[in-house]
UniProtKB/Swiss-Prot annotation:
May be involved in transcriptional regulation. The lineage of its organism: Eukaryota, Metazoa, Chordata, Craniata, Vertebrata. Residues 14-89 form the KRAB domain. The keyword RNA-binding does not apply. Its main location: nucleus. This is Zinc finger protein 776. The gene is ZNF776. One of its GO terms (cellular component) is nucleus. There is a cross-link at residues 171, 196, 220, 247 (Glycyl lysine isopeptide (Lys-Gly) (interchain with G-Cter in SUMO2)). A zinc finger (C2H2-type) spans 208-230, 236-258, 264-286, 292-314, 320-342, 348-370, 376-398, 404-426, 432-454, 460-482, 488-510.
Length: 518
């Protein structure tokens, strides 16, 4: 990457090309009517600025002597001066078709230059004028100018002793015009724009006053480009991209993005950022500052966007919708995670076993299987869990909370997955099918247990007698034979049973219920 350059100020003698932009007829045809008007205004304002700063223009490499065109300007920035042109010619006759019209308009109507000066035209329009012009500048140069090249190539400006910086409008003037038009669209709807930036005049027109030179302008576009011409620090120009700015911090940010360097580093954790604002937000992690507070529930956040996301909980707004299934979400990241269900994308892979996951948090939880880490402890019984969600689900055993209720039978469950499986009893859905015999099941666990019948697998072995079972529940019930445990007690007579099913059958003796009729 080439090193970024700081454009040096143009001091002493400069050509008008340093501040003017010329279009060919083909380029001119690409501009809209609004852009042409803007170009016209900007060139007039540039001419005004040059006059106000005490510049004079004449034919190249000649000593100034007063001829037929004089421009007198009383500037608030300079003492009285007189600028002269060294040849008795129509200036706009030497210009291209665009700049020529602008200079012609400025002189023909004795237009005041923003209220500070005036043109005085004393030109001879005799029939021999063009012939004299050819003899003075040469036939080749005249033909070139007739094709549209500007007279500015043959003119120079003698600057005052004070240094002055001309800012280029930009490599792509069309882009600059579009940018300025967009800025005007965004600000035109603000009711306080005139009170801040403009002074209303008669007829509803507004003057936009430059705060540095006090020069008034008829529109905001001209003021913006004028302020780029004022002496200031910079501009800072990136030699790679061609982008420029008058602010050193903006230039540093741009360079950081291009080089990959993050200039703003956190002193607490060594994390670095491209922008100072991002560093400020990050430091709230260490300070605990939460300046953004929800007006509904008083919950506070360290970032404004977090508050905006949270407020959708109260409003119920779900602006992010899945194109595949129509499901909507309150957060964009939730939509991105959901879309992986449709695409099958699993970007987070375990380095130990190669298993992949949709979400990073699921990978972190899975990795604790390999490390054996169980950082979440139940305060009631001391049991440890790999994830906070598993701990919260377990705590419902102690609290008796069953937040998931079936709308059909009002039966409630501790876990949402249990409710989902239960609802299949009402719907008759059996999504899990055995490939061996075609039998279907409500639950995936039931299918796995059934498949052990076909495979002959009995993974659960009794440590006392060596007997094996298909299901873990069957092993637990069997072990009660060895332990003598009978956990299911009848409330009527106190008789105890190893299995709950046996207790239910026994209770019919007391109720007189006859479940099976002939």
């Amino acid at each position: 990457m080439a090193a970024a350059a700081l454009r040096p100020p143009a001091q002493g003698t400069v050509t008008f090309e340093d501040v003017a932009v010329n279009f060919s007829q083909e380029e001119w045809s690409l501009l809209s009517e609004a852009q042409r008007c803007l170009y016209h205004d900007v060139m007039l304002e540039n001419l005004t600025l040059i006059s106000s700063l005490g510049c004079w223009y004449g034919a190249k490499d000649e000593t100034p002597s007063k001829q037929t065109l004089s421009i007198q300007q009383e500037s608030p920035l300079r003492t009285h001066w007189t600028g002269v042109c060294t040849k008795k010619v129509h200036l706009w006759g030497m210009c291209g078709p665009l700049l020529g019209d602008i200079l012609h308009q400025g002189t023909q109507h004795n237009q005041k230059l923003n209220g500070f000066g005036a043109y005085e035209k004393k030109l001879d329009d005799d029939a021999n004028h063009h012939q004299d012009q050819k003899q003075h500048i040469g036939e080749k140069s005249y033909r070139s100018n007739a094709k549209g090249t500007s007279f500015v190539k043959n003119c120079k400006f003698h600057m005052s002793h004070e240094p002055f910086i001309f800012h280029e409008v930009g490599k792509d003037f069309l882009s600059s015009l579009r940018l300025l038009q967009q800025e005007d669209i965004h600000t035109s709807g603000k009711s306080n724009f005139e009170t801040k930036h403009g002074i209303p005049l008669q007829g509803g027109k507004t003057h936009y006053i430059c705060g540095e030179s006090t020069i008034p302008f008829s529109n905001k576009h001209s003021l913006v480009l004028h302020q780029r011409l004022l002496p200031r620090e910079g501009p800072y120009v990136c030699s790679d991209s061609g982008k420029f700015t008058s602010k050193s911090n903006s230039f540093n940010n741009h360079q950081g993005v291009r080089t990959g360097k993050r200039p703003y580093q956190c002193g607490q954790c060594d994390e670095s950022f491209w922008y100072k604002a991002h560093l400020t937000e990050h430091q709230r992690v260490h300070t605990g500052e939460r300046p953004y507070e929800c007006g509904e529930c008083d919950k506070s956040f360290s970032h404004k966007h977090s508050l905006v996301d949270h407020q959708r909980v109260h409003t119920g707004e779900r602006p992010y919708e899945c194109d595949e299934c129509g499901k909507s979400f309150s957060h964009k990241r939730s939509l991105v995670h959901h879309q992986r269900v449709h695409t099958g994308e699993r970007p987070y892979q375990c380095g130990e076993c190669g298993k992949s996951f949709n979400h990073k948090c699921n990978l972190i939880q899975h990795q604790r299987v390999h490390t054996g880490e169980r950082p979440f402890e139940c305060t009631a019984c001391g049991k440890l869990f790999r994830s906070n969600s598993h701990l919260k689900e377990h705590q419902r055993v102690h609290t008796g909370e069953r937040p998931y209720e079936c709308k059909e039978c009002r039966k409630s469950f501790r876990y949402k997955s249990h409710l989902t499986e239960h609802q299949r009893v009402h719907t008759g859905e059996r999504p899990y099918e055995c490939r061996e015999c075609g039998k279907c099941f409500h639950q995936k666990g039931s299918l796995i247990q059934h498949q052990q019948i076909h495979s002959g697998e009995r993974p659960h072995e009794c440590g006392e007698c060596g007997k094996c079972f298909h299901q873990k529940g069957s092993l637990i019930r069997h072990q009660q034979i060895h332990s003598g445990e009978r956990p299911h007690e009848c409330g009527e007579c106190g008789k105890c049973f190893r299995q709950k099913g046996n207790l239910i059958k026994h209770q019919r003796v007391h109720t007189g219920e006859r479940h099976h009729e002939c």
